[in-house]
A protein has these predicted regions:
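Phosphate-rich ligand and nucleic-acid binding surfaces
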Residues: 1-332
Length: 332
C-alpha cells in the first residue's frame, strides 16, 4: 500500500510576497535551492496540545506555534525549515553567501560564534542572520512581538553543513538532516505544508506567491535492471510483476524496454544509486524471512601445510620443550 501524504491546500491573502522580500543565492555551490514564503498578521503563541505531544514524542521541545510548525514539518517530511522575523531583516533581503572574514553571529542558544570564510550563512543586507543549515541567529528570532514571518526552506551542500557544525561545535536536528543530503524537490511543498498548518490554527494569513531560487535542479536517477539479475543477486524467484508492484509502493516508477526494466528513483531516495539498491528494496518488502538460506556455490579444497611452516613449528616445539620461553610480539 502506498503512503498517503497530507493534502496541502492554502488560501492565499491579498498581500503579495513580490516586492516585499528579495532572495539571492551568491554561492550556488553550497546552496542549490532557496525557497521562501511570507506570513502576515501572525499571532505567536503556544501550539495546539496535539502538536506539542507529537513533538515531545519525537524528542523535540515545543517553543511556540511558528517554531513548532517548522519542526513538525521537518519530522513529517524530513526537510528542515527556518523562520525569520521579517521586520528584523535589514533591507528585507535574504542572501545565501559565505561568511565574511572576521564575521560573527550570536546564534539562538545565545552564544556568539566566530565564522570563517568557508561557512555558508543566510544574511540580510547588513549582517549574517543564520548559520545556514545549522542554527538561526538571535537577531532575527521569532518572538511574541513578531507579526510578519518569513519561512525558509533550502537545499544546502551536506558536506559544508557537516564541516561548519563541527568547526563551531554545534549540531542541531536540522544539521543532522542536511549532512545526509535532502530532497531539493520537496522544498516548496514543505513550505506550503507549514503555511497550511499555521493557517488552519488561525494564527496567520499567507501572502500570495512563493520566492523560489532553484539554480541546480536535482537530477532524476534511472537504474536499469532485470528481474533475473535481481533474483540471481538475492537467490530468489520473485516474478517481474511482483518486483514492479513492490517498487511502486515505495514511490519508484518502473519503465519496461524489451527485457530491461528501468526504475525511476524518487527524488527523496538519494541513497538509491545502483542495481543492488533496487534488489535491497525488493528483498526488504518481499521479506527476508521468505528468502531461503543457501550455501555458497564454490569449490573449496582442503589446504596443505607448507614445508617451511612445518619446520618452523617443529623448531618452536623442540625449543619450548627444552625450557625456553616464546614471546609473540606485534608484527608492526
Amino acid at each position: 500500500q502506498e503512503a498517503k501524504l497530507p493534502q496541502v491546500e492554502i488560501q492565499e491573502g491579498s498581500e503579495k510576497i513580490e516586492g516585499k522580500l528579495k532572495v539571492t543565492i551568491d554561492d550556488s555551490e553550497l546552496c542549490a535551492r532557496y525557497a521562501a514564503r511570507m506570513l502576515y498578521n501572525v499571532k505567536v503563541g503556544t501550539s495546539p496540545f496535539w502538536m506539542q505531544q507529537r513533538l515531545r514524542k519525537a524528542g523535540v521541545r515545543p517553543i511556540n506555534n511558528v517554531v513548532d510548525v517548522t519542526n513538525y514539518v521537518m519530522i513529517e517530511f524530513g526537510i528542515p525549515l527556518h523562520a525569520y522575523d521579517y521586520d528584523k531583516l535589514a533591507g528585507h533581503e535574504l542572501i545565501a553567501r559565505r561568511a565574511k572574514k572576521g564575521e560573527k553571529i550570536t546564534t539562538l542558544d545565545q552564544v556568539e560564534r566566530q565564522l570563517t570564510e568557508n561557512m555558508l550563512v543566510i544574511a540580510d543586507a547588513e549582517k549574517a542572520s543564520c548559520v545556514a543549515g545549522v542554527m538561526g541567529g538571535l537577531d532575527s528570532e521569532v518572538t511574541e512581538e513578531t507579526t510578519t514571518v518569513v519561512l525558509e526552506c533550502a537545499s544546502f551542500k551536506g558536506s559544508s553543513i557537516r564541516k561548519t557544525g563541527r568547526a563551531l561545535g554545534l549540531r542541531s536536528e536540522a544539521s543532522a538532516r542536511f549532512e545526509r543530503g535532502l530532497d531539493s524537490e520537496g522544498c516548496v511543498h514543505s513550505l506550503n505544508r507549514a503555511a497550511q498548518l499555521l493557517q488552519q490554527m488561525g494564527d496567520c494569513e499567507v501572502a500570495a506567491g512563493v520566492i523560489d531560487e532553484y539554480v541546480h535542479p536535482q537530477e532524476v536517477r534511472r537504474i536499469d535492471f532485470t528481474s533475473q539479475r535481481v533474483n540471481d543477486f538475492l537467490g530468489t524467484d520473485i516474478s517481474e510483476e511482483d518486483m514492479i508492484s513492490i517498487l511502486a509502493t515505495l514511490g519508484f516508477k518502473t519503465e519496461t524496454h524489451d527485457e530491461v526494466l528501468t526504475a525511476v528513483v524518487p527524488t527523496w531516495r538519494i541513497d538509491c544509486t545502483e542495481m543492488p539498491d533496487i534488489a535491497e528494496e525488493v528483498a526488504r518488502i518481499y521479506g527476508y524471512e521468505n528468502i531461503q538460506s543457501t550455501r555458497p556455490l564454490s569449490n573449496i579444497s582442503e589446504g596443505q601445510e607448507g614445508f617451511e611452516h612445518a619446520v618452523r613449528e617443529h623448531i618452536s616445539s623442540v625449543l619450548s620443550r627444552s625450557g625456553l620461553n616464546e614471546t609473540v610480539t606485534f608484527s608492526f
